[in-house]
């Protein structure tokens, strides 16, 4: 059995195959996921699992050098945005429109769908290197 915190085999598999600058998205339950992008659907019921707890778990495993966030997030969901900033600390944030974020999903290795229902609870994580 794994010793690290992330137990989901699908997420672990995607992360283990990621190289520098590859992208992984985490989204709320309403985020449209392109057909060509792998969907890892964790959503059970409204709010479960939550976006923040999913983000924290993934960041335990994935080295991230940059995140892409919809610029609408800060205005529409300021509490969520503040939590994200606290979690990612000094990681570079690139703001793009929500429409641009949805277009970027086709280039992600996978999208992890949560049960989150907070507006704009979506993020794209760009993989860094550990050396």
Swiss-Prot record:
It is an enzyme of class 5 (isomerase). It comes from the Bacteria. It is found in: Cytoplasm. One of its GO terms (biological process) is D-ribose catabolic process. Transmembrane segments: none annotated. Keywords: Carbohydrate metabolism, Cytoplasm, Isomerase. SUPFAM superfamilies: RbsD-like. Its EC number is 5.4.99.62. Catalyzes the interconversion of beta-pyran and beta-furan forms of D-ribose. NCBIfam families: PRK11797.1 (NF008761). This is D-ribose pyranase. It comes from Clostridium perfringens (strain ATCC 13124 / DSM 756 / JCM 1290 / NCIMB 6125 / NCTC 8237 / Type A). The gene is rbsD.
